[in-house]
Structures are given as structure tokens and as C-alpha cells.
Amino acid sequence: MGFFNDLSRRAVLAAALAWSGFSGATCLTAAPHFEAISIPGRLLEGNPLGDPSQRRVAVFTPKLPRFTSKLLTVYYLPGYGGSSEDFFGGNGEHFAAAFQNLADKGMPLRMVVVDCRNRWGGSQYLNSPAQGNYADYLLEEVIPFLEKYYGTPATPRDRIIAGHSSGGFGALRVAMMAPERFGAVVALSPDTDFEVTHKPLVEEHVIKSVTPKQLASYVAPPELMLKPGHNLIQIVLGLSAAYAPKGPNEPGEFHWLYDEKGNWQAEVWQNWLEEDTVVIARRNPHLFMPYHKIYLDGAEHDEFGAQKGAKVLRDLIKPYTRVEFFESPGGHADLIEDRLARGLEWVFERKLRTVGGR
């Protein structure tokens, strides 16, 4: 998949807010519990970064008793740099086991993992003329395609959107855009309160020192572009494309946070904040309906402080919808499967498991 294969996953995970075709369906021997389904990606065709439009989703369907009448779907959004492709290996087996365990306890859930990466690793699951329309791709293409494929048209309450890190942000942000499409959100260590989670990253010297010439080479057409030599630059390029596009008349272009002299551009930062879920909730805390269930978590020792913004968001929306916050032990990317399963148990109003002894 072109640029995607060049991503250094381990470095991205360490530096970022991160975790982190076939036709029809094919069971992969590397992870027999997941199937790969190719989505045409019509809404990504002609995207300004030249990224692939056709992508695969990873789908796990648990084994169910015959009398099970309904199978709900969890649309899972991985963290920055992650995608469905990660779930065709060892990582997928752990999630498959967790979802089979939930099904065995009377919580029948199909897990769908999407691929919304771009040239720099992650789209933040947003529509932007600097990268493409990834929220529309998820809402208007992936979900309808799969519901038709499986023959299971769903009511909004049959759909749960979930994610970790940038994917947790994406789950919240997409649900805010289209609250009528989902019944619940499970957001693990989401990118909330950018002053805490994002600003320390963009204030690093390596970001301040990017020159206009370097920036131009990074955003050049695929056949001419240069790959950033530092993974943090690559991440901030992706965040900039998501949060600060120049507009539809300049596809693929975005505003940088520093001018040619390295001076902070406050108006560009304000563009970023316009997408911050905490900022959005302060303006309008009635984002979700009373029937929605919003589960937020953040690690006790989260390296990016994601638990802080999650608590703020909880307090803002709590008077108007059902919301829960859980501070999990460990760091940003620890115990993801257990944390996700606990969030889903809360959605189903079941007894909550302990996570890391808590």
C-alpha cells in the first residue's frame, strides 16, 4: 500500500498519540478468526494525497448459539498509524478472543476494524480537503457496505463506535457529527483537550525547525515527495492535514503551526482547537441524546495526559447523557483488549471486569 508500508510502527507508537485488495471475504491463515473484506472506497477516489482508495476492513464474527437473535456491531478505530491490517496477525487473535468471551457471556458483538490511514499515518477520521473525506468514508460507505454484505440492516442502537488514542478521538468526533447513527461510544485514552495531549508534541524543537522548503517537499505529489526524517514530523503533518486545511481550492495543502522564522501561529492553533472534543463540548454540551451511552477511559500513567481531557469531557456532557469514566492502570497503550471489553460490558450494563487488578 505504498506509503503505508514505509511507516515505522514501533517508532510511531513511541512518539505519537498512538497504539496504537481482496474481493469478497477471505479467511487469512495468519489470524483465522478475522476475515478481510475489501471496500471499494469510492469516497476516497482522487484524494489529494494520492492514497489508495480501495482498502480492507478486518471483521471478527464470534461463534454464537443458534437462539441468538441479534448481533450488534462495534466499529473499531485504531490509533495513529494503526489499521485493519494489524488485525490479521497476532494482535488480532487477542481481540478475537476478547470478543468471543463477550459473546459467550451473552454480549454478541461483531468487531469491524477500519483502515483510515493516509500518507503520514493517520487521518484522525475527519473530512479535510488536505487529505480526503474519511468521516464520510466510514459513515456513508463502510457501514452501509457491511450491513448490506452481511444482510443485517441495523438501527442506530445496534451500532457502537469505539477506538483508542487517535481512534478514540475519531470515535467521539464521528459520533458528534452523526449522533443519530450510533447508540454508544467507547473511547479509550482519546485525544481530548489538545492543550494537554497535542501541544507538547507540536512545541518540540524538531517541529519548530521545519523549513518552508522541507514542508513543500513533504506535501509534494507522491512521485516527488520526500519522507520526513523524523517520525514526530510525520505525525504532525498528519494532524495538520486533518485539523488545519487551507480549503477546497487548495487540495492537499494545510497551514503549519510555525512561520518561516519559527514563530508560533496562534490562528493556526485555533484551527486545531476547533476539532477538539472538549472545546466542542464546552460550546454545546448537548452533543449526545439521553439514550446514548458514552464510555471514556484514560490510563493512570498516560504518557500524553489523555485521561485529563477525558475527565473534563465526562463532566461537560454528564448532565445530558449517560457517561462513564474509568482510569485504567498502566500507560497509554497498555491492556487495550481488557479496557475495550470493560467499556462494552458497561454499555451492556453487565458486571464490569477488573483491568490490571483494578
Identify the function of each model-found stretch.
Residues C27-R358:
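Non-catalytic cap/lid and distal C-terminal segments of serine-dependent acyl enzymes
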Residues M1-L7:
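N-terminal secretory signal peptides that target proteins for export/translocation
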Residues L17:
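Hydrophobic ligand-binding cavity/cleft-lining segments
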Residues S20, G24-A25:
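N-terminal signal peptide c-region/cleavage motif recognized by signal peptidases
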